[in-house]
Amino acid sequence: MAQHLTTEALRKDFLAVFGQEADQTFFSPGRINLIGEHTDYNGGHVFPAAISLGTYGAARKRDDQVLRFYSANFEDKGIIEVPLADLKFEKEHNWTNYPKGVLHFLQEAGHVIDKGFDFYVYGNIPNGAGLSSSASLELLTGVVAEHLFDLKLERLDLVKIGKQTENNFIGVNSGIMDQFAIGMGADQRAIYLDTNTLEYDLVPLDLKDNVVVIMNTNKRRELADSKYNERRAECEKAVEELQVSLDIQTLGELDEWAVDQYSYLIKDENRLKRARHAVLENQRTLKAQVALQAGDLETFGRLMNASHVSLEHDYEVTGLELDTLVHTAWAQEGVLGARMTGAGFGGCAIALVQKDTVEAFKEAVGKHYEEVVGYAPSFYIAEVAGGTRVLD
């Protein structure tokens, strides 16, 4: 796995690429979601946490109107130059569309960015792993601009600009969870977020003798091109059908009883399954938060398992790779629970594992996965850390 960078190394790399010293260095985390999957755009609750894998940045303000972007993850792209006056989506500009989108919407919101800057980026979130490398980069860009141009920016506004970039610049109809988790993250805390009201609690993540193991399928998932938007559309159509008899705006307003009672209104079996997942996953997330606060990790683990079953059978976003990881994890000693995390269709799963069984767990799950899928997965221990911040 890619290494963590010191600020010295970051500054040295910036100097090597741009020939001048960086003004400041920054870090923006990735995220895992403990439970509450595909509920954020359905007006439900989510339970994410920022992690110590993320995106490092170094920046230097320029005297002209040119933005110069460089990513150590895409060295072959070299330095990509963009005029500050021309911030539009261009496919050939690749990863830089994320920072371009953020800067565009900051300007649109009335923030003055009157000069260009040189921007060096290095991420140690595995690409396409579903740990929110794009939201990490969005928040990183916002915090860089905030400090270089002394913008008066509420963090929540920056979170919303990240989501706006994803939806209206990149073209992915994602919810607000990723940006919120990354922008508002705190050390050793998970974020219990109501995506309808944006009310949230920072919940101490006391896992006792257990750790969260991230299991990477190493199958890339492309969110923009996936069935993600299709699932969202199915849920929106289900809401329309339910509105014939119910005064609701989102599936997150319903409970288990209501979805059973009014299921006859949803005319398509697949849409009913999608709606049932959204409603029951929200209920599971409510219960999981109570269990974690009470220190009941066994119940928390069982809810994780139930979440995966629902994502596999009702929401149908898992696939061979994720199912192989999770089903194999369930069979191992010392595992309290396991589920896919993120949008699905590849990417990562997580497991709650007793510390002293982690090595045996990785060996057994890795071996079986390779036999079934044909290549090895990767494993990381999730360290829950703070949100996007200045390093020096």
From Swiss-Prot:
It is found in: Cytoplasm. Its EC number is 2.7.1.6. It catalyses: alpha-D-galactose + ATP = alpha-D-galactose 1-phosphate + ADP + H(+). GO terms for biological process: galactose metabolic process. It comes from the Bacteria. GO terms for molecular function: ATP binding; galactokinase activity; magnesium ion binding. Pathway: Carbohydrate metabolism; galactose metabolism. It is an enzyme of class 2 (transferase). It holds the Pfam family GHMP_kinases_C. Gene3D superfamilies: 3.30.230.10, GHMP kinase, C-terminal domain (3.30.70.890). Mg(2+) binds at residues 134, 166. ATP binds at residues 71, 128-134. Substrate binds at residues 37-40, 228. NCBIfam families: gal_kin, PRK05322.1. Catalyzes the transfer of the gamma-phosphate of ATP to D-galactose to form alpha-D-galactose-1-phosphate (Gal-1-P). Belongs to the GHMP kinase family. GalK subfamily. HAMAP family: Galactokinase. This is Galactokinase. The lineage of its organism: Bacteria, Bacillati, Bacillota, Bacilli, Lactobacillales. The gene is galK.
